[in-house]
């Protein structure tokens, strides 16, 4: 497995990486959550939101987006240098929903970015608190991962749309730092690299001059991030080759596509963090809970406990099923878009359906949607059990998967066989040995052929009762192997468009 010793834990990435013990890490993650909560409370006061309106997930998303936009230095600079009609580069805002005379009304608010930054810093003891901002970015990314299937983006870069289990974090902004890089899937990194290579092929000056030098450094850094996700020597050696290329072109492109495919069986290590909407942290802080004092972890029982005691509401369109809307948000809160549905159903305690079977659109409401017919309902975000999140990719084995998705990327460390459609995946490799790295390719293909669908990953790991905070009694679930394992099955999911 990956050399765990040299890698920093997510919490260290989350906390600027000084080696800390568990208690310090928990306190420092708790401090970040406190800051988000305090900011949210203050914004609800500014916007004069009632308790119910403050717990509306759509309002939470608008407030989160406002602060992310206020701190987006590069975009702010760009907007000031390229003024566009009707856009004030110094202001940020969005739709806020209020209940007026028994109806939901949309109100567009506009704030000075400077004012939002002031409120954010004040909530974070005068700090910029970039980690809190990244945390919100990852929550938005997890929500996108559960809502949209990135078929078009995959096809545009020449990847198979069925490889969606590799696309975690594909909508994360570039500025999301180490914590953001940790949650990006192999496919996401491959896609970012391919975009660079394609630009280099089309634009002779892309790698040249002072700008080209910066581009080159970014390219090598992305290669190293991707290399660090792979867990076999052959995959890593291929990444070295891609990184060291003098002039990245078609050969590197082919190698990256090959590596992405190989990751369906020889899975990369991708972090999973439970990032919740600000409207969960706000009320908890308001009720007097001190996250810094109590400590908090994004990968253990804490998010489960928090969701167990939270009330979150959502606007519901006329033909949407509130239970399905709840499942969408539940999966996002648990960063589980690419986990096996059999396990998710077990943890949640109610059946979790593939995306195409859900009668619900995304959580955000477009500005042209009619508010007259909008209802609201409680999101059911509680779980029956809790489980420890994993970063390992759970490699040993595999099993049958579905037409819409041919592999999984586990989110929880629980004993199971990981479904994947070996014949479909291997078919992509037959006769494709041209290229310069045939020995590494042969080695990777050999390992993939050796992977057995029946083998079990995370042996002996189980889920836990919510009362079992110290994780002493693992319950190992047994699964019906005949059941569908993947979420983007068949594919009725909408596309994610920026």
Curated annotation (Swiss-Prot):
It is found in: Virion; Host nucleus. Encapsidates the negative strand viral RNA, protecting it from nucleases. The encapsidated genomic RNA is termed the ribonucleoprotein (RNP) and serves as template for transcription and replication. The RNP needs to be localized in the host nucleus to start an infectious cycle, but is too large to diffuse through the nuclear pore complex. NP comprises at least 2 nuclear localization signals that are responsible for the active RNP import into the nucleus through cellular importin alpha/beta pathway. Belongs to the influenza viruses nucleoprotein family. It comes from the Viruses. Pfam families: Flu_NP. Its main location: virion. A motif (Bipartite nuclear localization signal) lies at residues 198-216. InterPro entries: Flu_NP. This is Nucleoprotein. It comes from Influenza A virus (strain A/Memphis/4/1973 H3N2).
